Amino acid sequence: MWVPTLSSSSCSSDERDESSGEAALTPVYLNVYDLTPVNNYLYWFGIGIFHSGIEAHNLEYCYGAHEYPTSGVYEVEPRNCPGFIFRRSVLLGTTSMSRSDFRSYMEKLSRKYHGDTYHLIAKNCNHFTEEVCLQLTGKPIPGWINRLARVGSFCNCLLPESIQLTAVSALPERLEFSDEDESNSEASSVSDEEGSEQHLINVADREIVYLQNKPVRLTREEIP
């Protein structure tokens, strides 16, 4: 009886499909930053005051505070968030989400995380990264990242007021915002030469951006 066999070309095609499927899985990292040098001591006790950002496709997104009812989500250079001290990067898992889908997801999620709703205990940067991590990998972030917030929920006076008002609101010196906020560009001192599709907010030369500064928005860029 004649039994059909797969040709070498079809086999190689299947192998390419499998390899492309594997290549489509992108690592997801949690980039952890210190808010204070005290973390060098607290870290060994399983606690600390940490800021975190989520990284995939060489894009890192974070969540910070400001006083406006607009998104507090912003994009930074991976592992280099201004105003914070990078500590370590944690591999959380992988995602099959494409770069364009990842960016679209972050833009949609940014509407939920307004700068004026940031709360150090109930809705901070680590809550944001955990929601993203659950969506992308199905796993939560490590418990030690946000442990102090859980402890602080039982003791609101746990953290100094100075840390609450400054450290959690550090934002990058150049922040991007979306097309839909083009009407706000004049208020944020954006030059007309930068075009209508992408705008950058120039922040004063200092590491910490306080709550009275301009609102932050994501940018909608063309994906190659």
Curated annotation (Swiss-Prot):
One of its GO terms (biological process) is proteolysis. Residues 26-163 form the PPPDE domain. It is an enzyme of class 3 (hydrolase). InterPro entries: PPPDE_dom, PPPDE_sf. Its EC number is 3.4.-.-. Keywords: Hydrolase, Protease. It comes from the Eukaryota. Belongs to the DeSI family. This is DeSI-like protein At4g17486. It comes from Arabidopsis thaliana (Mouse-ear cress).
